[in-house]
A protein has these predicted regions:
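Short, electropositive alpha-helical surface patch
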Residues: 9-15, 39-47
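Active-site beta-loop-alpha junctions enriched in small/polar residues
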Residues: 25-29, 49-51
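Extended, intrinsically disordered, low-complexity segments
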Residues: 62-99
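Short active-site-adjacent structural elements
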Residues: 31-34, 54-59, 63
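Catalytic cores of alpha/beta
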Residues: 27-43
């Protein structure tokens, strides 16, 4: 999809102009530093899916190639653990706090 170009000045103006939380839908191609800066510039909620599912798919491929096991519970657990790791990482990057 190419390199993301983020207009932080525009984001600042939007945040200043409207009294509602701002949501980022998708983050393909963004780095941890990009996410941190987006939060600093007013993003309140971040939706991401692709990175999580790609990590899960890669983990399942690696598991199947290494073990030759294709039982559903093994595949689901491998997928779950990989996706959980991505979500946990992003929660830390986003600076998410419990409510």
């Amino acid at each position: 999809k190419g390199t993301p170009h983020i207009d932080y000045d525009r984001l600042d103006a939007i945040k200043k102009a409207i009294p509602v939380p701002i949501v980022l839908h998708g983050g393909s191609g963004l780095t941890d530093t990009d996410y941190i800066k987006l939060v600093e510039h007013g993003i309140n909620k971040i939706n991401f899916f692709t990175a999580m599912t790609l990590a899960g798919a890669d983990a399942v491929k690696e598991f199947a190639a290494a073990t030759r096991k294709f039982q559903g519970t093994d595949v689901v657990n491998t997928l779950y653990q990989a996706e959980k790791a991505v979500v946990k990482h992003h929660i830390g990057v986003f600076g998410t706090q419990s409510i």
